[in-house]
Amino acid sequence: MNSNTDLHHSDDQDFSEFLNEYYLQSNSQSIEPEASYEDGEMEAEWLVSAGYPELTKPFEQGLEVSKKDLEPILTTLSKPHAEAIVQLVRTLNKTVRVRTKSRPKRKPDIRDVFREFDEQGTVTRSRSATPDSLDSLQIDEAWTNNSLPTFVNVYEKNTETAIQCVEQSNEIYLKQNLRRTPSAPPKSGTYADIFRGSQVRCDIPLYSADGVELLGYSRIGTIQFPRNRSVSDPFCSIGRSKESRSENDARSQKKKSSEVLSASENECGRLLPMPYNVLSFESICRDSSSLDSCEVLDTCDIPSTLFTDVVLISETDMKRLQTILWLELATIFDRNKVSLDKRKPFKRRRKEEGNLFGVSINALIRRDQQVTGTDSSLVPLFLEKLIGELLRRGSREEGLLRIGGHKQKTELLYNELESTFYQNPDNLDNLFRTATVHELSSLLKRWLRELPQPLLTNELIQLFYQCHTLPSIDQMNALSILCHLLPPENRNTLRSLLSFFNIIINLKDINKMNVHNVATIMAPSMFPPRYIHPSDNNSIAEQVRMAAQCCRLTNILILRGEKLFQVPNNLIVESQKTMMGKKGWHRHRNSNEITAKPSGKASNVGVGHDSTVINKYSTNLKHLHPFVI
């Protein structure tokens, strides 16, 4: 019982810590408006990101992509990546076909509807489309006739008789032969208001016709439509029907009451002895499947020659590599049947009014370069110094990141940094020395919380979250690919934070902060609720599941650490092969086989020469940014 009580207490404490950070995130900024993609737009965006915008042009014109245009591109790709391209193109073509079928058809012409009737007629008709052209009588003969049509005469004489005919429901009405008249001006009388518009240009119907029978009529304003009455109205049939239905339902419920009660008792008896079979925040967070896979991969001796650090790849090669990374990510998601839910960027930019807090990472780095006059490490200067101070004084502090600082002192420090950081950056060290480590950790979480865009970017954060549906190995590969796709400043900032978290975790015996504690505290900052939120905000189960998955993903990101930023060399070689394929890869390869090349030079890069690729990036360090913790 004591172990169960401790587990309950730990579960409640962890979830309450997450909720505290979650509410701080929710109260700071409202939920971002989501701009949804139209059908096919997301697939077109993926093709553009993968470097194949030419495949989206037929879709923009409402046409399907032909095999003739697709085959030359597929020959330059590996089989999994080619299948990913084919799947995206197939979706675009399907969208085009659906749009073509859903287009509104032309309204049918009235002359087409009565074409057979017109062909069978023997009387020459007028070419006009007026009702007079449909009359079977000649115009002169109709107007020279002194007597009114049969219907008019009968109606004037037998108005009361016709009203009685309406009340007699079982009476059989006489049928007469079909007879149509031109639009004669009706006589003034009591019948003028029977048919609305009869004084304009409307044919007067007869009592009977071939296939048409006049059953009755009502004066305008005499027809009463039923009104919706309240259930308490004694004249309301709706209420009586509802009561009868409720009585029937009550009888059926009485018959099933014993079965329901017995089933509920069995269910409660099954769940009460095992309270942890229900949805639990702690059980999802501590799901050991992915965490065990991380530990297995960490213990395996994977040769470092198979990977290249992302900071060693030049900017030009990184742009070329991103096309393959998008295809590799699409392959992983398609293989596991997970939707490529790439978030559509919000066009209207948020106004950045702050000086240090509430400012994008890119803007902070530009300001740092203006102040220091040197190349930046693509990590904000404020964050570098803040992490350095926390590591120097607080790495062994118990409850670091969990315990909050003094609220009033933290607010004073926040205002001082916001107003004087870039005006007097040398004073930063003095401000940090006067603050406690818990106040500094509160500033770190607040800085992440007030970023105008999430650290994982608005475009990729939904893909990061969807990785929780992938199996363990694919999940870690997808997370690594997404880290490579981040902008350089976001990627380096994330790397700096993960390194800081791992240093804290390595001292968990002293500071009492293990990986689960750190992930629970930092998950709302990594996955802000204004971007990642359940579809049903009123469902407690959905909220708990979402919170637990965010903590679990943050846990995996921390455990993987530096391994997230290692690029497989086979992807680097494939990116070169793809680029060469667009420019004549086969011709270039044949010329390299004929021409003798000196050995040991980094410029001679071919397919399958992984060591040569590593030498190339190892010798070119001009683009290398210093990485500071």
From Swiss-Prot:
GO terms for biological process: positive regulation of cell population proliferation; regulation of actin filament polymerization; regulation of small GTPase mediated signal transduction; signal transduction. Residues 237-261 are annotated as: Disordered. Keywords: Cell junction, Cell membrane, Cytoplasm, GTPase activation, Membrane. One of its GO terms (cellular component) is anchoring junction. This is Rho GTPase-activating protein conundrum. The keyword Amino-acid biosynthesis does not apply. Disruption phenotype: RNAi-mediated knockdown does not affect epithelial integrity or apoptosis. One of its GO terms (molecular function) is GTPase activator activity. It is found in: Cytoplasm; Cell membrane; Cytoplasm, Cell cortex; Cell junction. Residues 185-294 are annotated as: Required for interaction with Moe. It holds the Pfam family RhoGAP. GTPase-activating protein (GAP) for Rho1; functions with the ERM protein Moe to regulate Rho1 and control proliferation in the developing epithelium. Recruited by Moe to the cell cortex where it negatively regulates Rho1 activity. Can also promote cell proliferation independently of its GAP activity, perhaps by acting with Arf6 to positively regulate Rac1. The gene is conu. It is a peripheral membrane protein. Changing residue 402 to A: Required for activity. Inhibits negative regulation of Rho1 but has no effect on the positive regulation of Rac1. PROSITE patterns: RHOGAP. It comes from Drosophila melanogaster (Fruit fly). The keyword Calcium does not apply. The record marks 402 as: Arginine finger. Residues 240-258 have a biased composition (Basic and acidic residues). SUPFAM superfamilies: GTPase activation domain, GAP (SSF48350).
